[in-house]
Amino acid sequence: MLVCTNRPPVSPVLQLCRFASNVVLFHLKIVKQIKFEFLNVFNLKIKRLQMETEVYYGPRDDSFKDFLIKIFKLMDMGSTRSETSNFLNTYINEETLPYFNMAFTSSSANELNNYELFEQMGDSTIGKFIVWSSYEKFPQLRGKPEAVEIVARMKINLGSKDNLSQIAEDLGMWTFISATEEARHRLKKKLLEDVFEALIGVTEYIIYEFTDTNYSQPGLAYQLVYSLLLKLFDPYILKIDYNTLVDSKNRLKGVFDQYKDKLGLQPVYQSERIVKNDKNVFLSKVYDGNGNFLGEGTAPLKKEAEKKASEVAILTLISNGYKKNIPSLYETL
């Protein structure tokens, strides 16, 4: 049985009220969403501001002093326990600890008393050490003009941020570095590198300043720091190997230099951001001067992606008969 019901027509006023109600609800939802997003952004800014202003202070208790003693003991000063104790007490005491504190404090934690002075000293000392110790470790390089390039590469690799920060982290320096929370979050490698250089600088400075002039000798501070650096760098010393000392981009450039009439003056890189395995990475492709594709590589950093692409390009060129003649001094070592 079919039943028909005739609903009365909705009045225009009621329609308008319903429409207005829907509009209000819609705007309330938008306002709520905007408020939610605003609060999220606001909270993130507050958190970042707190990180920018909140300072982490590394411990300066006995653990800090014990760390310094461990470093100074590597210099092997004193043949007896008494001599060693006198050596340590001379350079690690209430008078010198403020200098060590500065060496482990970044400018983000203290604009005035920070590691920048000692970092400058340590940077020059480490650079000199790497050059001289390279000629000491590899006597076959001495007096050879072509060795300049090899030692320069050694200095670049051993004195790099990656290497110095690794040495510092392996020594356990991170916990003692004072800096803002943001700096510690974003600049860990830089802080480790800088403070390692500052540690070397302040060590040399303190030995120079606090050695009794009646017993001191010219260059004593550097001699002791040199012996310290020999031990600190020993696990990281590189062999004289072309593929180890020269990064892939420079090795690829060397191939182009040798075959520039056929390959062009230099490799051409094209890089773009892509999503790979749900991560943003760089995809770098490399071509010769004639537009021929040689290889590609991906990495989080553009520089690393180009290095990976260069490795592939070198293999491609070798398979096509373009192999660089390695300098003879590398081959004899």
UniProtKB/Swiss-Prot annotation:
Keywords: Endonuclease, Hydrolase, Nuclease, RNA-binding. InterPro entries: dsRBD_dom, RNase_III_dom, RNase_III_sf. PROSITE patterns: RNASE_3_2. CDD domains: RIBOc. Residues 81-208 form the RNase III domain. Its EC number is 3.1.26.3. Residues 250-319 form the DRBM domain. GO terms for biological process: RNA processing. It holds the Pfam family Ribonuclease_3. It catalyses: Endonucleolytic cleavage to 5'-phosphomonoester. Coiled coil: none annotated. One of its GO terms (molecular function) is ribonuclease III activity. Belongs to the IIV-6 142R family. This is Putative ribonuclease 3.
